[in-house]
Amino acid sequence: MPTISVNLTTQKYQIKIENGLATSIGREVQRVWSVRKIALVTDTIVGPLYQAQITEQLTQAGFQVTVLTIPAGESAKSLEQAMSLYEALLTANFNRSDGLIALGGGVVGDLTGFVASTYMRGLPFIQIPTSLLAQVDSSVGGKTAVDLPAGKNLVGTFYQPELVLIDPQMLETLPQRQLVTGYAEVVKIAALVGADFWNLVQQIESPTAILDKAPELIARSIAYKAQIVMADVQESGQRRLLNFGHTIGHAVESLADGELTHGEAVSIGLIAISRLFEQPTQIAAQLQTVLERVGLPVTHPLLQSPALFEKIAHDKKNQGALINIVYLKAIGQPTILQLPLTQFSAQLKMKQRSF
């Protein structure tokens, strides 16, 4: 299975993708870290599945492991939970020569990365993502964040892991809804890339097929994202392409207040933005076919909400009174359009009822 290298100006690290890799965690961590204290951060769902075996491997490799368990779910991605982890690290006498490992989905990875980047001005950390969403998206690229009541990811840093270890077989323990929600990000990237990757997702007709093709789907998604990240670490240019579907998707997700998963909101956002900037190539229809096959939603009543634009207007990706919109001219042909928020608002209101 592939190993993808991320080579940045200030740091290099590897992303290893291999079935059964969960049985070799101790050896893999030994390759990048000397013996030290490790805080293994996990949640109340993933912990009971994998925490014991990974703790045992790390201990056998000579590491001193402290397990820190957070509640499962988006609500744990908070400043309050970060403070709880800071205090636990202080109690266990962690310093900058020690390290953190994130074992879980996107919430665990985002929170652990944020704590690693800020505790004592930075501790090394490793990602072991266990959900498809985390494996193809949040574990790669160095974005860390916590949420505020006003919205998602409003406090965060850019901070790269020192290693990412991905075992596609871990996806077999995911509930189907969580598997499918991660697939929305795969479809997003495949639509940006086009060509063989788009042909591959067109062959996926069920959640079972996602599992069957998981190693290839993960590797292709990460290869593209790593290429983008290496060219634009802090999202000042090309990396904005990865926000395809997220402008409206994040707003809907915030308004849904936990009713929708991130991937479900992105799926809705992909269709909405494609309808808003419809092309002769019928992008929305092509995306809808691929998304609906696995049970992802493509519309939602909240798209009609008067509060939708207010959420979009407070998106952290905006630049003053300007908004950067990513849409496709055709599959594999993404473009970034910068518009005044007032113009986008008018265009949104004009087509909002058709969503």
Swiss-Prot record:
Cofactor note: Binds 1 divalent metal cation per subunit. Can use either Co(2+) or Zn(2+).
Family recorded in the similarity comment: Belongs to the sugar phosphate cyclases superfamily. Dehydroquinate synthase family.
Reaction catalysis annotation: 7-phospho-2-dehydro-3-deoxy-D-arabino-heptonate = 3-dehydroquinate + phosphate
Keyword Electron transport carried by entry: no
Binding site for Zn(2+): E185, H246, H262
Protein EC: 4.2.3.4
The keyword Nucleotide-binding belongs to this UniProt entry's keyword annotation: yes
Any one Gene Ontology molecular-function term assigned to this protein's record: nucleotide binding
Name assigned to this protein: 3-dehydroquinate synthase
Species: Latilactobacillus sakei subsp. sakei (strain 23K)
Needed cofactors: Co(2+); Zn(2+); NAD(+)
GO biological process, one term: chorismate biosynthetic process
Annotated metabolic or biological route of this protein: Metabolic intermediate biosynthesis; chorismate biosynthesis; chorismate from D-erythrose 4-phosphate and phosphoenolpyruvate: step 2/7
Subcellular location: Cytoplasm
Family matches, as Pfam families: DHQ_synthase, DHQS_C
One term under GO cellular component: cytoplasm
Stated role: Catalyzes the conversion of 3-deoxy-D-arabino-heptulosonate 7-phosphate (DAHP) to dehydroquinate (DHQ).
Binding site for NAD(+): G106, V107, V108, G109, D110, T130, S131, K143, K152
Keywords from the named record: Amino-acid biosynthesis, Aromatic amino acid biosynthesis, Cobalt, Cytoplasm, Lyase, Metal-binding, NAD, Nucleotide-binding, Zinc
